[in-house]
Regions:
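A structural motif at transmembrane helix-loop-helix junctions in multipass membrane proteins
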Residues: 19, 131-167
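Alpha-helical transmembrane segments and their short interhelical loops
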Residues: 89, 97-147
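Alpha-helical transmembrane segments of multi-pass membrane transporters/translocases
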Residues: 26, 35-37, 191-230
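N-terminal Sec/SRP start-transfer signal
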Residues: 1-21
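Hydrophobic alpha-helical transmembrane segments of multi-pass membrane transport proteins
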Residues: 46-111
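Hydrophobic alpha-helical transmembrane segments of multi-pass membrane transport/permease proteins
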Residues: 14-41, 49-65, 156-168, 207-217
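Short hydrophobic, aromatic-rich alpha-helical segments embedded in or entering the lipid bilayer
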Residues: 2-6, 172-207
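Short alpha-helical transmembrane interface motifs in multi-pass membrane proteins
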Residues: 59-64, 94-95, 120-128, 173-176, ...
Length: 230
């Protein structure tokens, strides 16, 4: 537990130094504040930008941050130094994961406030965001572990991130894309957020999210056993 706390605090201290990571945490929360207050269009669904950017935030920020942090520290041999200080690989990953998850959940609070969620809807919204963020973290960790350096991680992260963050938005305009996107967790997060307070949660959404989690967990185990953090 002490090592996990040390890794967590290390990342917190480096937040302001790592501008690319900081931008990921702040970009969509800042955008939603601006767009919700600056753009008013007739017949626009209530809190349209909150729902749109919340889903994009889930698909982009945690995934990008996890892959970037892991691959960067592998490249700089920071991980090797941590291993020599008796920090176990899983302790490192839990520490990094907790840091990214909490930072993203802080951003989720801004989405919740901008969306005027209250009572049960607030807690359900935060739960949906928490699950989506965790899934994206797993995916980002797989990429970070598999890739040798930050450049190769970025080349893999960008297309994967675009799939999970942009498919839900594109699916609203194209039925064919919607049929493809339906199997992704980010699209199910999109469905759950847009139906919050108006429709019941469908079992299909929970099954697809669970299936996505299982696939991500299996890939994580494979990546960790094959590559480790060396």
């Amino acid at each position: 537990m002490r090592n996990i706390n040390a890794v967590f605090l290390k990342q917190v201290k480096e937040t302001l130094k790592n501008k690319s990571i900081l931008i990921q945490f702040l970009m969509f929360p800042v955008m939603v504040i601006i767009m919700e207050n600056a753009v008013k269009i007739d017949d626009m669904p209530e809190h349209f930008f909150v729902k749109l950017f919340a889903v994009m935030f889930v698909g982009m920020a945690p995934l990008t941050c996890m892959s970037s942090i892991i691959s960067e520290e592998k490249e700089k041999n920071t991980l090797r130094a941590l291993m020599m200080c008796n920090v176990k690989p899983l302790e490192y990953l839990v520490g990094i994961g907790a840091y990214v998850w909490l930072m993203c959940m802080a951003g989720s609070l801004l989405f919740a406030f901008c969306g005027d969620y209250s009572g049960a809807d607030f807690f359900v919204f935060m739960l949906i965001m928490a699950i989506g963020i965790l899934l994206s973290e797993l995916t980002g960790a797989v990429i970070g572990i598999f890739c040798k350096n930050q450049m190769s991680a970025t080349s893999v992260t960008v297309p994967v991130m675009m799939v999970f963050s942009f498919l839900p938005m594109l699916s609203t305009f194209n039925e064919t894309i919607e049929k493809v996107a339906i199997i992704t967790y980010s699209q199910q997060i999109n469905i759950l957020i847009n139906g919050l307070g108006t429709t019941d949660i469908k079992p299909e959404s929970l099954i697809i999210i669970a299936a996505n989690f299982l696939v991500s967990a299996i890939l994580f185990v494979i990546a960790f056993k094959k590559k480790g953090l060396e």
